[in-house]
Structure formats: C-alpha cells, structure tokens
Curated annotation (Swiss-Prot):
Name of this chain's protein: Cytochrome b
The family this protein is said to belong to: Belongs to the cytochrome b family.
Organism: Sorex vagrans (Vagrant shrew)
Cofactor note: Binds 2 heme b groups non-covalently.
GO biological process: mitochondrial electron transport, ubiquinol to cytochrome c
Subcellular location: Mitochondrion inner membrane
Entry superkingdom: Eukaryota
Cellular component, GO annotation: mitochondrial inner membrane; respiratory chain complex III
Length: 379
C-alpha cells in the first residue's frame, strides 16, 4: 500500500512542500529565516486575534481598552507584548531574509523575489496601521504625519488624504478602518506567502555557492525540519526574553500618553523598523521628492535583478561586492540611527549623505563592481 502522504490530495501538497522536498545539501542557517517568518506570522495572527476580542476601535475607548487588556484580562499583558515585540522580531527576520537574498543572488528567481517585495510592502502597511491602534500620542501623530504625505501627490493628493481619513482629520473613522485593514491584511500576507513558496518550489532553493545543486539534493525532512526547529526555539527564546524582561525596550514612551490633537510630541518618529525609510524621507527638503524617495527606498529592491551584471550568482566568491554589501548594511544602520534623531545639525547632513550612498550603492556601485570582477577573472 502506498504511503497516505503521497496519495491523499491534501497531504500530497504538504508532502511535496515540507517532507520529500529536494533541498540543496549545503544551505546555511541564513536559509532558516523563511520558516521563522512563517512562525512570526502565526504568532502575530493568534495574539492579534485574542487582542481583537478585547480591543475597541473607538477614539474614546481605544486607549483604555488596551490598558484594560494589560490590567484585567488573564495574561493580557503577555498577549499584548508578544504581539508588539513579535512585530519587531518579524522585521528583524524580514531584513535578514532580504539581506540573505541580496548576498547570495536569490533575487534571480524573479517571481519569488517580486512576490517577496510585495510581501514586504504588505507587512510594512500592516505594521503601520497596527501602530495607530493603541491611540497613544505617537499613534495619532504618526498616523497624521504619514497619511499627510499622500497630499504631495499632484491634483488628487488632498482629496485622497481626506478619503483615507474619512473626514478632515485623523479621527474615529480613520481608527475604525485602520483596525479593519490591520485585521484582514495578515490573512492576505499568509496567502501571498503561499504564492511565494509556490514559485520557490518551481525552481528549488538557491544555495550559498550560487551554483546548480541538482546533482546533490537531500530530503527536507528530517534534515531541514530539525534545523528549522532549532531556529524556531532560538526565536522563541529571544522573543520571550524581550517580552518578559524588557517589553518596552523597542517602543516609544510617548505612546503611553493618550492621543491629544492639541499637543504635538517634540519628536514624531515611527517604530524602529521604519526609521531607515523615515530618514530617507526627511533627507529631501521637497515634500513630493521625499515621498518618492521613501517609496523608492523599498521599490528599488524590485530593480536589483535587472542590475545583476556579474557572471556569478552569489557574492560568496566576490570580495569587492562583499565589501559594498557590508557598506550597505552599515549605511542602513546609520539611516536607522538618523531616523530617530531630531532634525538638526549634524544629523541632517549625515542623513542626506547616507541616503545618497544607499541609492548610489544599489543602482551604480554594485553593478559596476560586478563588471570589474568579471574583468579580473577575464570573463
């Protein structure tokens, strides 16, 4: 009798995706982040579901409903901080996952990469709307500032902003619709992640060498299931440590003050994972230019496959490209730091230089360096 997992219509899909999937024998721990992102998404959906049972999306009661969750609901504080810090873990895994893709040339799987860029946008939109829900000072002013950026769009900008707000300012209608979108988007993300995997399994995984690994494949289970479980345990260790010992480490103290439209916080800034994009936005004095730079800072990822000039796929054997990659990482860390600083000297000029370097590295220096490396090898 044939094994049930190979004959049952539903089990067959699971089997070919997670059990008998042929995987390269040499993929490193950098390939763990896909499964970790899946775990993060499940944690976020489950904790979010329980939070939604007690949360009220009304401007008068939103802040106090979050307080009620933390004080009166059994383990409400745990669920709330798992959800808040789970978002941070989600983005850490996302950035490392994208970084891995850049370093090892995984972007050459065009469909998989483009769905990934779409996923990144969806996760960022979800996180932004989630940050508005507690209705603290930073929630309100963050929502006001970021939605206001759309007014820079010529002709339709002002109407578009009022349409999103559902009125003439960020108010009850805005909060209600943000809650609705914040609830539905993770399920759209889950569906997109399924498509992401579907396209990935069409080609098979890349590997650190960037070479074809068809001659040396091993089954996903038990080798990579065990490896993924180790990654998940480490993720849970870091997340629970953060939640139980320093739950507010990555948050903003201003968000413990209820939203007040009459009192602007001294420094309006988003969550830490948006600071690099926020720094790029602020480094351009023109409003429309800033908005374009903000969108392009993420959208530039979609262009990377077309700028791949090297004859090799991975950066594993390309030391000059490796140098530029790590300069890009340092540049992004600099932008993250600048995004959290006030708009004054010397932070303005540092932010502007870091923003120029970011686009220069991706669009100009990396492709040219790849051509130079080809010439060195007489290719």
């Amino acid at each position: 009798m044939t094994n049930l997992r190979k004959t049952h219509p539903l089990m067959k899909i699971i089997n070919s995706s997670f059990i008998d999937l042929p995987a390269p024998s040499n993929i490193s721990s950098w390939w763990n982040f896909g499964s970790l992102l899946g775990v993060c998404l499940i944690v976020q959906i489950l904790t979010g579901l329980f939070l939604a049972m007690h949360y009220t999306s009304d401007t008068m009661t939103a802040f106090s409903s979050v307080t009620h969750i933390c004080r009166d609901v059994n383990y409400g504080w745990l669920i709330r901080y798992l959800h808040a810090n789970g978002a941070s873990m989600f983005f850490i895994c996302l950035f490392l996952h994208v970084g891995r893709g850049l370093y090892y040339g995984s972007y050459m799987f065009l469909e998989t990469w483009n769905i990934g860029v779409l996923l990144l946008f969806a996760v960022m939109a979800t996180a932004f709307m989630g940050y508005v829900l507690p209705w603290g000072q930073m929630s309100f002013w963050g929502a006001t500032v970021i939605t206001n950026l759309l007014s820079a769009i010529p002709y339709i900008g002002s109407d578009l902003v009022e349409w999103i707000w559902g009125g003439f300012s960020v108010d009850k209608a805005t909060l209600t619709r943000f809650f609705a979108f914040h609830f539905i988007l993770p399920f759209i993300i889950a569906a997109l992640a399924g498509v992401h995997l579907l396209f990935l399994h069409e080609t098979g995984s890349n590997n650190p060498s960037g070479l074809c690994s068809d001659a040396d494949k091993i089954p996903f289970h038990p080798y990579y299931t065990i490896k993924d479980i180790l990654g998940v345990l480490l993720l849970i260790l870091v997340l629970t440590s953060l939640v139980l010992f320093a739950p507010d480490l990555l948050g903003d103290p201003d968000n413990y003050t209820p939203a007040n439209p009459l009192n602007t916080p001294p420094h309006i800034k988003p969550e830490w994972y948006f600071l690099f994009a926020y720094a790029i936005l602020r480094s351009i004095p023109n409003k429309l230019g800033g908005v374009l730079a903000l969108v392009l800072s993420i959208l530039v990822l979609a262009v990377i496959p077309f700028l791949h000039t090297s004859k090799q796929r991975s950066m594993m054997f390309r030391p000059f490209s490796q140098c530029l990659f790590w300069i890009l990482v340092a540049d992004l860390l600099t932008l993250t730091w600048i995004g959290g600083q006030p708009v004054e000297h010397p932070f303005i000029i540092i932010g502007q230089l870091a923003s120029i370097l970011y686009f220069l590295l991706i669009l100009v220096l990396m492709p040219i360096t790849s051509l130079f490396e080809n010439n060195l090898l007489k290719w």
